[in-house]
Every structure is written in C-alpha cells, then in structure tokens.
C-alpha cells in the first residue's frame, strides 16, 4: 500500500524563509495562494497586468506582480495556469530568470513528463496535485479540513525538494486529509487515462449511447434523459460515498441483478482491449503529440467535435428538463 503523509509528519519549516510565486489566479491558483498565505507563507501572485485576475488578487489582499518580476523575487514558482499555456509562459517569462536552487512546482505532470517544459539541471522540480477543484481546496481549508493530494519529485537539485513538496502540500491544507507519493509519469498517465476512459470520455459516450438507443427505439427523449443522464448523479454519489458494494446495498434487487448480469456485456473484453490501446497511446506519447499538434494548428478537430456534441438532442432535451429543476442551475 502507498504511504500517506498527514499533518503531524510534515513540517512547514523548510518554507519559512521562502517566497512562493503562484502563476495564475484561477480555480486552483486562487486556492493555493490564499491557503499558503493563511499558513504564514510569503506569497506573490503572478498574472497578466491589470486583468481580472490581477484585480481580484489585489482586492483579496495578495501581493501581485508581473510573472517575470515575481520569478526573480521567488524561491518557488508554482504553475497553476492551463497546461496548454505553460510552455510559452515558461520559455518567455520564467526560464530567462531562473537561478540555482529555485524550485518549479506543478499540479499536473503533463508538460514535464512529455518534455514540453525542460527545466535546467540547477533547480528542483516537484508536483502537488490536489484531488479536488480549487473552490473545495479553499473552502475545506477555511473549515480546518483539507482535500487529499498527490505529490512527486522529478528533480532534486537541493536535496530538499521532497521536504519542499510535502511542506507545500501542508501549506494548502492537503496533509490534513493525507498526501500520497507518486511520480510525474504515474500521475500523468493515470490522470489522462481516467479522464479519457472513465470520468469524461467513457461516461459521456455511455450516456449518449444509452440515450440514443432508447430514443431510436421510440421512447420519449425526456424519459430517456431521466434514465440515462439525470439519475447518473444518484448512483455516482453513492459510489463516491462508500464504493461499489455500498451503492449496491442502496438499490433494488432488480437493479442489482441487472447491474451484475448486464453490465459486463456492455463493458466486456473488447472494451478492455480498447482501454489498453488508449493506455498505450498515452504511455508512448501518441496522445500527447496529437493534442500538442491540435493546439498548434488552432484546434479544428477539437472544436468540431465539441460543436457536434453541443448540437446533440440530449443537450436540447436536458435544457428543458433542467428548467423544471431550478436547484440545478449552475452557480456563477
């Protein structure tokens, strides 16, 4: 079993004389910056001058600087902007100002693992990846709790990088829940696999296929929406709360029997073969190359596929159904 680190096992001392720059002030960036500041750390928020993030960070009492200025004043530089934006920012506004013994931090391993960012040998490189969205990271911290996280060390120039990563995790509240050690390779490949095969790609494809099957068989789209999409949350919440066996204790015997006898006919050995193929595409860098190229040429395939799904009947029906449920309206 993996080793899990908690509050009492981790010291903030290694960060006591450090200045931490957070690049970005979005969902994760804001949470990390505020939590670290409240943990007594010296924090600089580095964002585009006079943009919305700049103004918000100032309003919330943060020290705000241009990225290149912040890098020169910092000991730790944490990248909390989208993966696709990081390489250019690193090349133009971070790399020219790096000095020995600084540390580069990431919340996802993609750019390091796939060599989109190649750090010089004289810096530390680590990752702290909370397993929850930024607002939850902040809210639980304020409540005296925390969101679990993964941490990893890629390059340990100072021989203190592991301590720095753990202290950073404690600073954002993660050790209150527990942090698990991994590698950049493991985090990147499993994260991409989970997104593509289960959490995003797998789930949305399954929902659409089920919805289409019922509608094509003559059932009302509204009823198909309820059965194939709306009720998904009820089941996933139970699984999230206590696991698959816990969920099965909460459903009818009829549903349970259908689950264990029909489910394996949908996700079968052929499905697993395709899963293994997708995993191999992640491991050998094929997916990364494809996604990087897609961004370089303006995302034509990506945008077309998104548009196709946005025009799907399930979206039109869902909009009508959700009007009946005002409590589901997204918070702005």
Curated annotation (Swiss-Prot):
Residues of the KARI N-terminal Rossmann domain: 2-182
PROSITE patterns given in the database record: KARI_C (PS51851), KARI_N (PS51850)
InterPro entries reported for this sequence: 6-PGluconate_DH-like_C_sf, KARI, KARI_C, KARI_N, KARI_prok, NAD(P)-bd_dom_sf
Pfam families listed in its UniProt record: KARI_C (PF01450), KARI_N (PF07991)
Pathway: Amino-acid biosynthesis; L-isoleucine biosynthesis; L-isoleucine from 2-oxobutanoate: step 2/4; Amino-acid biosynthesis; L-valine biosynthesis; L-valine from pyruvate: step 2/4
Amino acids binding substrate: 252
Domain KARI C-terminal knotted: 183-328
Keywords noted in UniProt: Amino-acid biosynthesis, Branched-chain amino acid biosynthesis, Magnesium, Metal-binding, NADP, Oxidoreductase
The keyword Magnesium belongs to this UniProt entry's keyword annotation: yes
Binding site for NADP(+): 25-28, 48, 53, 83-86, 134
Active-site residues, Swiss-Prot/TrEMBL: 108
Gene Ontology cellular-component annotations: cytosol
Alphabetical GO biological process terms: isoleucine biosynthetic process; L-valine biosynthetic process
GO molecular-function terms, A-Z: ketol-acid reductoisomerase activity; magnesium ion binding; NADP binding
Binding site for Mg(2+) 1: 191, 195
EC number of this enzyme: 1.1.1.86
Catalyzed reactions per annotation: (2R)-2,3-dihydroxy-3-methylbutanoate + NADP(+) = (2S)-2-acetolactate + NADPH + H(+); (2R,3R)-2,3-dihydroxy-3-methylpentanoate + NADP(+) = (S)-2-ethyl-2-hydroxy-3-oxobutanoate + NADPH + H(+)
HAMAP family, alphabetized: IlvC (MF_00435)
Family statement drawn from the similarity comment of this UniProt entry: Belongs to the ketol-acid reductoisomerase family.
NCBIfam families with a match to the protein in the record: ilvC (TIGR00465), PRK05479.1 (NF004017), PRK13403.1 (NF009940)
Annotated protein name in UniProt: Ketol-acid reductoisomerase (NADP(+))
Taxonomic lineage from the root: Bacteria, Pseudomonadati, Dictyoglomota, Dictyoglomia, Dictyoglomales
């Amino acid at each position: 079993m993996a080793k899990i680190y908690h509050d009492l096992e981790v010291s903030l001392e290694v960060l006591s004389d450090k200045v931490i720059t957070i690049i970005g002030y979005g969902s994760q960036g804001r949470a990390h910056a505020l939590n670290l500041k409240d943990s007594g750390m010296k924090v600089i928020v580095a964002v585009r001058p006079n943009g919305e993030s700049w103004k918000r960070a100032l309003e919330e009492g943060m020290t705000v600087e241009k990225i290149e200025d912040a890098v020169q004043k910092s000991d730790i530089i944490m990248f909390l902007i989208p993966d696709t934006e990081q390489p250019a920012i690193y090349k133009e506004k971070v790399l020219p100002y790096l000095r020995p013994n600084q540390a580069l931090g990431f919340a996802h391993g993609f750019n390091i693992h796939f060599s989109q960012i190649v750090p010089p040998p004289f810096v530390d490189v680590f990752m702290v990846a909370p397993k929850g969205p930024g607002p939850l990271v902040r809210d639980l911290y304020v409540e005296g709790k925390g969101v679990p996280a993964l941490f990893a060390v890629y390059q340990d120039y100072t021989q203190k990088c592991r301590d720095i990563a753990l202290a950073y995790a404690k600073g954002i509240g993660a050790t209150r829940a527990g942090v698990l050690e991994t590698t950049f390779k493991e985090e990147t490949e499993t994260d991409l696999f989970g997104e593509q095969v289960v959490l995003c790609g797998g789930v949305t494809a399954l929902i659409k296929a089920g919805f289409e099957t019922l509608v094509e068989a003559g059932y009302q789209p509204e009823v198909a929406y309820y059965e194939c999409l709306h009720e998904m949350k009820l089941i996933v919440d139970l699984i999230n709360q206590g696991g698959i066996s816990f969920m099965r204790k909460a459903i009818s015997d009829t549903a349970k029997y259908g689950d264990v006898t029909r489910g394996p006919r949908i996700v079968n050995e052929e499905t697993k073969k395709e899963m293994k193929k997708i995993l191999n595409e992640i491991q050998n860098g094929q997916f990364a190359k494809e996604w990087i190229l897609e961004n370089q040429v303006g995302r034509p395939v990506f945008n077309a596929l998104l548009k196709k799904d946005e025009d799907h009947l399930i979206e039109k029906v869902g909009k009508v159904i959700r009007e009946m449920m005002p409590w589901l309206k997204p918070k702005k």
